[in-house]
Amino acid sequence: MENIMTLPKIKHVRAWFIGGATAEKGAGGGDYHDQGGNHWIDDHIATPMSKYRDYEQSRQSFGINVLGTLIVEVEAENRQTGFAVSTAGEMGCFIVEKHLNRFIEGKCVSDIKLIHDQMLGATMYYSGSGGLVMNTISCVDLALWDLFGKVVGLPVYKLLGGAVRDEIQFYATGARPDLAKEMGFIGGKMPTHWGPHDGDAGIRKDAAMVADMREKCGPDFWLMLDCWMSQDVNYATKLAHACAPFNLKWIEECLPPQQYEGYRELKRNAPAGMMVTSGEHHGTLQSFRTLAETGIDIMQPDVGWCGGLTTLVEIAALAKSRGQLVVPHGSSVYSHHAVITFTNTPFSEFLMTSPDCSTLRPQFDPILLDEPVPVNGRIHKSVLDKPGFGVELNRDCHLKRPYSH
């Protein structure tokens, strides 16, 4: 009988944060909204708060960057470590160090599903269906996958069964699809700048933006709109039809996450050939099942917010059973290792984090070292051939550990 590899147990879990309301501003990292001034990601983008004039010009004005980056590190008995980042900041540190630690330490490094289920069950009474707690659980889950991969010496995508394609092709999210085309991306997704409180004038302005980019990018380059939960069904339907002449590929996250009936109605009334997408701010498998039943075309979970890689794999299987696509929201290497194994993810998202979208900057810069960026809009699977997620923690960042156990 052949010997079976003996796996170590987890000895320590630690949680740090950078950025957020109680630290330095513009820290970037896992909270990619936490950028400095003059950045496209904070420039008059439509949000649920845009109806209040005091908060319509800047997303940071209503506190989109108050959480900061959570960094979770798990250490095995053999002193190998795995880590991950998400958006949960100092509050996420408390949850990890004062609650979730009991489900992690002492477990085998391969006990990922057990730990995941225990974290979900133990936080159910205060987690709801997503948000800060789910972000924290996601971060722990990703750190566990990173550790497991490093212990066995395999990239995470091989732990999931291996790649189903040689490379990942990307569209770019940012204010300049025309620049994205020059960089080799297959499409460009722009934020909307106006909402229902702006009436038909807002629709005309955003449609004019799409028309301008269509002229600059030519007839075949994909163009999409990201509405970031800022609209109602009536406005979203009108906007979709106003943009249809310019071959808009999809309209994204028009409504708040809980408005499932609204998504069903929007899908029913959208122009023929235009896709309706959502999922970035949904958490838990159950919420994605309900979202899938609305008939939307693409589900877009964020692996750092939806419950981690363990949940993302379940969401992809759910979508596949219904003939739907899964195209995760950003998330860099944490998505790369998943989507290259999914048969229903033909492309992926790259979030432009350079201020004017003119250069390629790693999404979670500066917290990750060796974080890859697309070359000519693509990342080959060989780039992912490093143990775990293939990145290291930049300990030169101002890491703060406010709690311990």
Curated annotation (Swiss-Prot):
Entry's EC annotation: 4.2.1.90
Residues at the site labelled Transition state stabilizer: E349
GO BP annotations, alphabetical order: amino acid catabolic process; carbohydrate catabolic process
Binding site for substrate: H33, R59, E349
Binding locations of Mg(2+): D226, E252, E280
Site (Increases basicity of active site His): D302
Catalytic class of the enzyme: lyase
Co-factor(s): Mg(2+)
Cofactor binding note: Binds 1 Mg(2+) ion per subunit.
Signal sequence region: none
Gene Ontology MF, one: magnesium ion binding
Alphabetized SMART domains for the sequence: MR_MLE
Gene3D superfamilies: Enolase-like C-terminal domain, Enolase-like, N-terminal domain
Record keywords: Lyase, Magnesium, Metal-binding
Key word Metal-binding present: yes
Location of the active site: H329
Reactions it catalyzes: L-rhamnonate = 2-dehydro-3-deoxy-L-rhamnonate + H2O
CDD domains: MR_like_2 (cd03327)
InterPro entries: Enolase-like_C_sf, Enolase-like_N, Enolase_C-like, L-Rhamnon_dehydrat, Mandel_Rmase/mucon_lact_enz_CS, Mandelate_racemase_C, Mandelate_racemase_N_dom, RHMD-like
Role according to the record: Catalyzes the dehydration of L-rhamnonate to 2-keto-3-deoxy-L-rhamnonate (KDR). Can also dehydrate L-lyxonate and L-mannonate, although less efficiently, but not 2-keto-4-hydroxyheptane-1,7-dioate.
Family: Belongs to the mandelate racemase/muconate lactonizing enzyme family. RhamD subfamily.
PANTHER family in alphabetical order: ENOLASE SUPERFAMILY, MANDELATE RACEMASE (PTHR13794), MITOCHONDRIAL ENOLASE SUPERFAMILY MEMBER 1 (PTHR13794:SF58)
Record's subunit section: Homooctamer; tetramer of dimers.
General remark: Reaction proceeds via a syn dehydration.
UniProt protein name: L-rhamnonate dehydratase
